[in-house]
Design a protein with these regions (language model features):
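HIT superfamily nucleotide-processing domains
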Residues: 1-112
Length: 112
C-alpha cells in the first residue's frame, strides 16, 4: 500500500528502531509510547484489520504470537508480565490501517 505508514517503515522509507525482523515480521519501538516498553509487531504483508485475516494468514498470525513470545524473553519482560493489544477499526483506536500488535510492559499496567 503506497500511503500506509507501516508499509513505508517496512520498505525503509521511514526510520524505526527495530527490535526484531525476519522475512515476514517487523517489530519496532512505538514513537509515542504509552508504557516504558511499547513495541509494535507487524506483518510485512499488508492486512488492514483483523477482519481481513484469512485462513491463509493463520500461520502468519501464529508466527506473530511466537515472535511476541521471543521478544518478551529477549527484553526480559516475560517474568513480570506484559500486555498485547490489537485494535480493529477506527472506533477501537486503530490509527494505522495495517494490522499490528502493541506489546506494553515495564510497569504495572492498570486493568482496562
Amino acid at each position: 500500500m503506497e500511503d500506509c505508514l507501516f508499509c513505508k517503515i517496512i520498505k525503509g522509507e521511514i526510520p524505526s528502531t527495530k527490535v526484531y525482523e525476519d522475512d515476514e515480521i517487523l517489530a519496532f519501538k512505538d514513537i509515542n509510547p504509552v508504557a516504558p516498553i511499547h513495541i509494535l509487531v507487524i506483518p510485512k504483508k499488508h492486512i488492514k484489520t483483523l477482519l481481513e485475516v484469512t485462513e491463509e494468514d493463520s500461520k502468519l498470525i501464529a508466527k506473530i504470537y511466537m515472535t511476541i513470545n521471543k521478544i518478551a524473553k529477549d527484553l526480559g519482560i516475560e517474568k513480570d508480565g506484559f500486555r498485547v493489544v490489537a485494535n480493529c477499526g477506527r472506533d477501537s483506536g486503530q490509527e494505522v490501517m495495517h494490522i499490528h500488535f502493541h506489546m506494553l510492559a515495564g510497569k504495572k499496567l492498570e486493568p482496562k
